[in-house]
Amino acid sequence: MQTLLALNWKMNKTPTEARSWAEELTTKYAPAEGVDLAVLAPALDLSALAANLPAGIAFGGQDVSAHESGAYTGEISAAMLKDAGASCVVVGHSERREYHDESDAXVAAKARQAQANGLLPIVCVGENLDVRERGEHVPQTLAQLRGSLEGVGADVVVAYEPVWAIGTGKTATADDAEELAAAIRGALREQYGARAEGIRVLYGGSVKPENIAEICGKPNVNGALVGGASLKVPDVLGMLDALR
């Protein structure tokens, strides 16, 4: 199974900055065997990425509408992302769940829309600090996973985000990542049977060049969803080098 390095820019980079980033990457990029690279960018950046990314690097969106089309002002449909050249899209990111009150049902609807339009959904799940401290992190995350995959096909990626370790002073370890990735793998087997073996489980919590090899070296971790370290080309190259 190919490792997936998914670069989540969040709300960063104008189209001009995205073009400069892609041009810089082009001058220095060498594919890493066994590693797929995808850039998850603001919607306005997609055309710049389509025109300037090196061949073989995928790109996609950070959110998608749960609706096919219609009177949903401000929304971006899966068909629009696909037409812009995207091949994947994040749904259910912890920031969307927290700041936009997205439910598991809405996340599942978005994932279904993505799949219906030929996009690979990257479904995010994870627990907060209160849940972690109560020792309920595994059942809570798996309940979120099942709700977020309701009616969703096996052509999906799952990203575990340790929300409790983001901006709290707490540190998630590679073993923490493996614990949840293994539990997620078990839940995927229950839902999808043998097809679960082809589903990549990513880890998304302060991943950087210094720790990505240890994290992705765990048996059930098949890649990383990277935030801050995705914004600078040298950091991206450092992560690719660490995975070689």
Swiss-Prot record:
Disulfide bonds: none annotated. It comes from the Bacteria. It catalyses: D-glyceraldehyde 3-phosphate = dihydroxyacetone phosphate. This is Triosephosphate isomerase. The active site is at H93, E161. It is found in: Cytoplasm. One of its GO terms (biological process) is glycolytic process. InterPro entries: Aldolase_TIM, TIM_sf, TrioseP_Isoase_bac/euk, Triosephosphate_isomerase, Triosephosphate_isomerase_AS. The keyword Isomerase applies. One of its GO terms (cellular component) is cytosol. The keyword Isomerase applies. CDD domains: TIM.
